[in-house]
Amino acid sequence: ASTPDEVAGEASESVEENEHPDTKLAAERLADLQRLQAEYVNYRNRVERDRAREKEATIGSVVESLIPVLDDIELARQHGDLTEGPMSKIADKIESTLNRFGVARFGAVDEAFDPSVHEALMHVEAEAPEGVDGTFVVQVLQPGYKVGERVVRPARVSVAG
């Protein structure tokens, strides 16, 4: 008096016992091949991720070294020295080249203060703009720069609120 499960188990055991050695070897080799293929895909993905991270770090270090130049360009633009002429075109080319590499300038008056992207250098009294609660930016002393999501330099700002 055997149950159907016991009969099925005995049948599969007898099939495994009668299985040809080459079939077992082929199954083992297939499993090895699939495992190696998965390891290779993971390796390729890891290398691509590392390359992207290294590229972003390299661009970030170049931007860090160019920050004084970018600050001078911004000051010249604020003082009206870059309204036209060859220096204006050079400044525009530098900024557009950096934009192509994912460099973004940030920091604007009346935006909410965020300590992860702003560095508050001064606190002053001022009326809060409509729709802004809490601390907000009153003046941008030096803009901040990002490469992707990485903050290269926080925006240096004056805040109120």
Report the location of each language-model feature.
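Charge-rich, N-proximal long alpha-helical rod segments
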Residues: A1-P68
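Structured alpha/beta interaction-core segments
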Residues: D72-G161
